[in-house]
C-alpha cells in the first residue's frame, strides 16, 4: 500500500469512526447532564429519561429498515442523508426551549439519522478495505463507539460544568459538517437493483422491536414478572412480560411475511436465509452479549464512582480512562500484530479478560474503599472489549457477500441496541432489588433502629429504594427529624446495601460473560481476512 493509499484509507477510517463516535456519544453525555437539562428546560428528570428512552427506541426499531434503505439507494448516500438528518436534530436539540422540542430534535431526528448512518458504516468499511484489512478497520470503528461511552461523562461533565450542555450538541453540528466534507473520499458500495422497500416488513420490525425494547426499558418501573407495588399489571403479571411477548409474536409474523415476500419473487427487507448462517449467527450473538455486558458495566461503575464515592462527572470520566486506552490499543494491536490469529481464540481470551475485570471489581468492592480500586478492573475490561471489537465486525460481514453488508449492518446494530437496552435494564433492576433487600434486612437487624421504624420502612420501600449518596440521605433524614443515632445507623446500612447491590448486579453480568463463552463455538477459527466463500448454513 502506497503512502497516498494509506492516507486515503486513514481519512476514510477517521470519517467512519467519527460517525460511530458521535452516534454513541449522545446518550452518554445526556446521562450525566440529566439534572442540568431538566432544570434548563423547566421539566423533570422523568421527562428527560423519557427522551432517552425514545432515542433508544427509535434507533432500535429502525436499524433494519435503515440498513435496507442503504442497500437500495447506496450506502454513502444513506450515510450522508443520515448525517444531514442527525445534524438537524443536533441543532434543534441545542436550541430546544422545551422538552417537546428536545424530543423532536434528539429522540426522533437524531434517532432516525443514526438508523441510517450506523448500518451504512458497516457496509462502507467493507467497500473501502480489503478482507485482510477489515478486522483492524472494524476494530477501530467499534472502539470509537465504546470510547464514546467512556468519554461521554468526561466530555459532558466538563462542558456542562463550565458552560452548558447545549454546546455539546452545537459542536456535533460542526463535526457532522466536517464528516460530510470528507465523505467524498469514501468509496461507495454499488446499490442493489431498484426494488420497492418492503413497507409491511418495515412496519412489522418497527412494531415488534419497539414493543420488546419498550418493555425492557420500562422494566425498572414496572418489574420484570411480578408487578411492583402500585405499578400496572395485566392478569397479575407485569406489563414488561406482555410487551416482550407481543414483540416476539410480531417478529415471528415478520419472519413469516418475509418468507411470503421471497416466495412471490419480491425483494424482502431481510433475507431470512442469512439467519441460517452459523458464522453470522455467532457474530450477532457475540455482539448482543458484548453490548449487554458493556452497557451493564457502564451503568454500574459510574454509579459507584459518582454516587457512592461522590466524584464529579469529570472525575468519573478520568477513572474510566484505563478502559478507554486499553480498548483502543487492543482493538488496533491485535489485527496489526496478529493478523492470522484465530477469531474464536481472540474472542474467548477477550471474554476471559472481561470476566476477570468484572470478578476482580466484585472482589474489591467494600465499604470505605476509594476510586483507585476500579483501575485494574477497568484495564482488564478494556482489554476484553478491545479484543472483541477487533474481530466481531469482520466476522459478521465476512459471513455474507459484500452486496448484503447493508442488511448485516442493520441486523448488527439491532442486536447491539437490544443488548445495550437489556444490559442497562437488567443491571439497574438487579441493583435496586439487591439494594432494597439488603437495606431492609440491615435496618431490621440493626439494634440502633427501632422496630417501628424498620417495619414502616419495609412497607414503604417494598417497591424499591433509590441509589442515593450519603449526602442525599443525610439531608432527607435531617428533614424528617430522625435522631442522630438512628440516622447514623441508617446511613451505615445504606452504605453496605449500596455495595451489596453493586456486587449483585456485577455478579449477574459475570454469569452472562460465562454464557457468552459457550456461544464462541459459532465463531470461526480461520482468520476472516483469508476465508473464501460463504460458511456452511445450520
Which sequence ranges carry the predicted segments?
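Transmembrane-helix exit segments and adjacent C-terminal regions of multi-pass membrane proteins
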Residues: 1-16, 20, 260, 279, ...
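Flexible interhelical linker loops that connect adjacent transmembrane helices
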Residues: 2-3, 180-209, 222-236, 260-278, ...
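Transmembrane core module of solute transporters
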Residues: 9-59, 63, 164, 235-242, ...
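Small-residue (Gly/Pro/Ala) motifs that create kinks and tight helix-helix packing interfaces
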Residues: 34, 148-160, 334, 423, ...
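Helix-loop-helix hairpins in multi-pass membrane proteins, especially solute transporters
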Residues: 71-209, 218, 227, 235, ...
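C-terminal module of multi-pass small-molecule transporters
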Residues: 73-88, 92, 96-104, 117-123, ...
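C-terminal membrane-cytosol helix-exit motif in multi-pass small-molecule transporters
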Residues: 173-191, 208-221, 246-262, 517-524
Amino acid at each position: 500500500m502506497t503512502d497516498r493509499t494509506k492516507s486515503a484509507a486513514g481519512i476514510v477510517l477517521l470519517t467512519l469512526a467519527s460517525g460511530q463516535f458521535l452516534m454513541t456519544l449522545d446518550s452518554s453525555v445526556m446521562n450525566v447532564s440529566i439534572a442540568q437539562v431538566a432544570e434548563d428546560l423547566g421539566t423533570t428528570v422523568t421527562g428527560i429519561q423519557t427522551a432517552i428512552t425514545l432515542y433508544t427506541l427509535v434507533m432500535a426499531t429502525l436499524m433494519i429498515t435503515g440498513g435496507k434503505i442503504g442497500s437500495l439507494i447506496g450506502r454513502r448516500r444513506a450515510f450522508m442523508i443520515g448525517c444531514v438528518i442527525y445534524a438537524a436534530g443536533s441543532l434543534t436539540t441545542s436550541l430546544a426551549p422545551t422538552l417537546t422540542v428536545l424530543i423532536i430534535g434528539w429522540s426522533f431526528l437524531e434517532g432516525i439519522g443514526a438508523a441510517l448512518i450506523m448500518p451504512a458504516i458497516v457496509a462502507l468499511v467493507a467497500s473501502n478495505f480489503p478482507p485482510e484489512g477489515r478486522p483492524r478497520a472494524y476494530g477501530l470503528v467499534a472502539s470509537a463507539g465504546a470510547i464514546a461511552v467512556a468519554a461521554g461523562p468526561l466530555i459532558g461533565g466538563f462542558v456542562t460544568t463550565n458552560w452548558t450542555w447545549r454546546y455539546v450538541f452545537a459542536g456535533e453540528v460542526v463535526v457532522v459538517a466536517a464528516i460530510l466534507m470528507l465523505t467524498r473520499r469514501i468509496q461507495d458500495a454499488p446499490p442493489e437493483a431498484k426494488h420497492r422497500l418492503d413497507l409491511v416488513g418495515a412496519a412489522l420490525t418497527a412494531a415488534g422491536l419497539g414493543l420488546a425494547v419498550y418493555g425492557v426499558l420500562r422494566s425498572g418501573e414496572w418489574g420484570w414478572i411480578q408487578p411492583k407495588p402500585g405499578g400496572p399489571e395485566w392478569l397479575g403479571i407485569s406489563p414488561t412480560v406482555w410487551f416482550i411477548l407481543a414483540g416476539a409474536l410480531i417478529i415471528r409474523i415478520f419472519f413469516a411475511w418475509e418468507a411470503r415476500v421471497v416466495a412471490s419473487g419480491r425483494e424482502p427487507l431481510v433475507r431470512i436465509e442469512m439467519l441460517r448462517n452459523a458464522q453470522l449467527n455467532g457474530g450477532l450473538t457475540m455482539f448482543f452479549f458484548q453490548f449487554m455486558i458493556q452497557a451493564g458495566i457502564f451503568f454500574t461503575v459510574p454509579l459507584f464512582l459518582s454516587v457512592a464515592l461522590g466524584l464529579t462527572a469529570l472525575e468519573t470520566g478520568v477513572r474510566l480512562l484505563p478502559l478507554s486506552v486499553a480498548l483502543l490499543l487492543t482493538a488496533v494491536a491485535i489485527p496489526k500484530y496478529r493478523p492470522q490469529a484465530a477469531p474464536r481464540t481472540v474472542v474467548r481470551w477477550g471474554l476471559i479478560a472481561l470476566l476477570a475485570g468484572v470478578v476482580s471489581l466484585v472482589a474489591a468492592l467494600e465499604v470505605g474503599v476509594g476510586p483507585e480500586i476500579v483501575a485494574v478492573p477497568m484495564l482488564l475490561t478494556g482489554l476484553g472489549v478491545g479484543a472483541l471489537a477487533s474481530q466481531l465486525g469482520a466476522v459478521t460481514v465476512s459471513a455474507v457477500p459484500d452486496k448484503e453488508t447493508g442488511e448485516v449492518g442493520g441486523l448488527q446494530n439491532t442486536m447491539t441496541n437490544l443488548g445495550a437496552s437489556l444490559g442497562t435494564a437488567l443491571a439497574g433492576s438487579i441493583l435496586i432489588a439487591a439494594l432494597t433487600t439488603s437495606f431492609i434486612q440491615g435496618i431490621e437487624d440493626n439494634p440502633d433502629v427501632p422496630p417501628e421504624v424498620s417495619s414502616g420502612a419495609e412497607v414503604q420501600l417494598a417497591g424499591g429504594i433509590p441509589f442515593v449518596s450519603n449526602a442525599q440521605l443525610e439531608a432527607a433524614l435531617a428533614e424528617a427529624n430522625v435522631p442522630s443515632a438512628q440516622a447514623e445507623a441508617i446511613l451505615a446500612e445504606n452504605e453496605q446495601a449500596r455495595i451489596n447491590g453493586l456486587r449483585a448486579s456485577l455478579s449477574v453480568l459475570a454469569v452472562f460473560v460465562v454464557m457468552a463463552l459457550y456461544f464462541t463455538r459459532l465463531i470461526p477459527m480461520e482468520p476472516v481476512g483469508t476465508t473464501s466463500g460463504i460458511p456452511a448454513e445450520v
